[in-house]
Amino acid sequence: MLKEYLGISLFLAAGLIIPFLAFAVSRLLQTRKNSLVKGEPYECGMETIGDTWIQFKSNYFLYALVFVAFDVETVFLYPWAVKFQQLGTFAIVEMFIFITILVVGFWYAWKEGALEWK
């Protein structure tokens, strides 16, 4: 029974160990010399005038979030479209329900004004 889970266990272990190992190696190899120049903001080689920090509009984040949500739709639609002829009626109904949920989500985002630039 344990042999069945060996492959997924190895992938899980590798997925956890490799990022931590990469961060550890990066931390060990980094340079640690701090100076005043490194702390200054760089803007075309000129000294900045005024406040360099501006408030970031949340509209960009909202557009990105909506884009990712509907981009995932294409990831699921592509394999279904490739095997469309071999799939039965159940798969067609299932995809219809999936697309309906996404259309309702798109309609809700539109209704709430998430797609309007303010």
Curated annotation (Swiss-Prot):
EC id: 7.1.1.-
GO-annotated cellular components: NADH dehydrogenase complex; plasma membrane
Membrane topology: Multi-pass membrane protein
The keyword Transmembrane helix is annotated on this UniProt entry: yes
Compartment(s) where it occurs, according to its Swiss-Prot or TrEMBL record: Cell membrane
MF-aspect GO terms: NADH dehydrogenase (ubiquinone) activity; NADH:ubiquinone reductase (non-electrogenic) activity; quinone binding
Major place of residence: membrane
Pfam families: Oxidored_q4 (PF00507)
Swiss-Prot/TrEMBL keywords: Cell membrane, Membrane, NAD, Quinone, Translocase, Transmembrane, Transmembrane helix, Transport
Keyword Cell division set for record: no
Highest taxon, organism lineage: Bacteria
Transmembrane segments: 5-25, 61-81, 90-110
Catalysis performed (reactions): a quinone + NADH + 5 H(+)(in) = a quinol + NAD(+) + 4 H(+)(out)
Family membership: Belongs to the complex I subunit 3 family.
General function of this protein: NDH-1 shuttles electrons from NADH, via FMN and iron-sulfur (Fe-S) centers, to quinones in the respiratory chain. The immediate electron acceptor for the enzyme in this species is believed to be a menaquinone. Couples the redox reaction to proton translocation (for every two electrons transferred, four hydrogen ions are translocated across the cytoplasmic membrane), and thus conserves the redox energy in a proton gradient.
PANTHER family membership: NADH-UBIQUINONE OXIDOREDUCTASE CHAIN 3 (PTHR11058:SF9)
Entries under HAMAP family matching the protein: NDH1_NuoA (MF_01394)
Subunit structure: NDH-1 is composed of 14 different subunits. Subunits NuoA, H, J, K, L, M, N constitute the membrane sector of the complex.
Protein known as: NADH-quinone oxidoreductase subunit A
Species this chain originates from: Heliobacterium modesticaldum (strain ATCC 51547 / Ice1)
